Amino acid sequence: GVSGVAAQRVGEKLFQVSLGKQVMCVTHLPQIAAMADSHYVIKKEERSGRTYTDVLPLDKEGRLRELARLHGGDNITELTLASAAEQIENAAKFKETVKKRP
């Protein structure tokens, strides 16, 4: 298991790998998720005694809310939303820096 700075480095490495290959990653770590270009949420629910799994694409707002949920659980607040927005912004800055390298 990784968290904190180690999770951040894993996310950065996955992004660098994605520059030459397609990467699909399932994670509960916001540090890794923030690096992604596309986001999906996987939801499981029971209907009529059967379990169904749905994979739903997230738009910009959905991405922000899902990262906030990873930070703070179901209690999404202005603070968790701000933290998620900052993490997305920091990831974008890192990605731009890497793309500019020769």
State each model region's role.
Residues 1-2:
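ABC ATPase nucleotide-binding domain "signature" loop
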Residues 5-102:
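C-terminal lobe/lid and adjacent interdomain/linker elements of RecA-like ASCE P-loop ATPase modules
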